[in-house]
């Protein structure tokens, strides 16, 4: 079994590009406290929206779907799950809420990770959660002709317990020593977790929950207000490319963590930029809702979609956004471009 190194390997990752990304995130974190203190009411809205978006996106990445209406009902606990997909969505909501409410007291130890996995499947039948895989698994990919091939072979089932113990022990040693920036350590831990692939099912969703937990513990709580899972969903191909690049040679200890670390730092930067933008838009609540939508369009260079407007104005209903866009097109203030999912709007 390979060694888990969180001392020497991270030091090799401190390239000028990664150092610049880390420094930028530190700056955003400094401003984060000011936003949190000054915008309490606005943040409540962002929190509620992000909870729904995170739950939906993380499950969709794994092919678990329900309607938008059912998703909102499940996340707000106004409905009971009706099928397997909804059971898994409800379980994700439970674990995400646990992390949001008590991340300071949750440490990434094997027994805790097993408990979180148990809760992930708390609505599911058959006792799928709370124990490591009982058979070897393979991460496969399907080519253009529909043929499957092994992309990565994780740690065998009989070594999983030992691998998780060692991973968590070495990671927590480095975390507590505090010699390496936690922004670099966290993606390394997540990559190792995914290469172990400790569970029969739920590894991808657990990896994203653990990512949020660790970023929160390190003081980067932007994921509460902007869905990092949705940002990952939007860049899913890049995510899998980075994962594949960083997992090559992992068993031999010859892999490079750099692609995966850079990917996650990029997601964090994007999340902070969106957070600051959304808080700024929410400050305009004294304006009417149509005027706020108009202000969003005015501040956008190039095309903007209905979905982007709704993400920036999470407290404005879809009907109001659609009605306002229709009126602005009729008045000649904006023009509609494209068709179908790519439909957007530009200033005239």
Regions inferred by a protein language model and the residue ranges of each:
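FIC/Doc superfamily catalytic core
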Residues: 1-348
């Amino acid at each position: 079994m390979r060694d888990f190194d969180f001392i020497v390997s991270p030091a090799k990752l401190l390239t000028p590009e990664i150092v610049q990304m880390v420094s930028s995130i530190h700056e955003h974190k400094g401003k984060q406290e000011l936003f949190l203190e000054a915008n309490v009411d606005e943040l409540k809205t962002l929190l509620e929206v992000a909870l729904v978006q995170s739950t939906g996106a993380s499950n969709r990445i794994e092919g678990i779907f329900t309607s938008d209406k059912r998703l909102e009902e499940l996340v707000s606990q106004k409905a009971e799950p009706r099928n397997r997909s909804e059971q898994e969505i409800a379980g994700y909501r439970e674990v995400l809420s646990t992390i949001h409410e008590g991340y300071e007291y949750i440490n990434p130890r094997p027994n805790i990770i097993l408990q979180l996995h148990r809760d992930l499947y708390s609505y599911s039948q058959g006792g799928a959660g709370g124990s490591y895989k009982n058979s070897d698994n393979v991460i496969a990919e399907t080519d253009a002709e529909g043929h499957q091939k092994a992309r990565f072979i994780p740690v065998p089932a009989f070594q999983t317990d030992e691998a998780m113990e060692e991973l968590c022990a070495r990671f927590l040693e480095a975390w507590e020593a505090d010699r390496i920036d936690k922004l670099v350590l966290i993606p390394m831990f997540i990559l190792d977790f995914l290469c172990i692939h400790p569970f029969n099912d739920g590894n991808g969703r657990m990896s994203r929950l653990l990512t949020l937990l660790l970023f929160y513990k390190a003081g980067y709580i932007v994921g509460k207000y902007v869905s990092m899972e949705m940002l990952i969903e939007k860049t899913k191909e890049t995510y899998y490319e980075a994962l594949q690049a960083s997992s090559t040679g992992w068993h031999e200890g010859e892999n490079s963590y750099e692609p995966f670390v850079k990917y996650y730092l990029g997601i964090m930067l994007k999340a902070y930029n969106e957070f600051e933008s959304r808080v700024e838009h929410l400050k305009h609540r004294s304006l009417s809702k149509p005027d706020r939508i108009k202000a969003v369009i005015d501040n956008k260079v190039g095309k903007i979609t209905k979905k982007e407007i709704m993400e920036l104005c999470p407290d404005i209903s879809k009907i109001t956004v659609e009605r306002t866009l229709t009126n602005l097109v009729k008045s000649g203030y904006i023009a509609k471009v494209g068709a179908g999912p790519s439909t957007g709007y530009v200033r005239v």
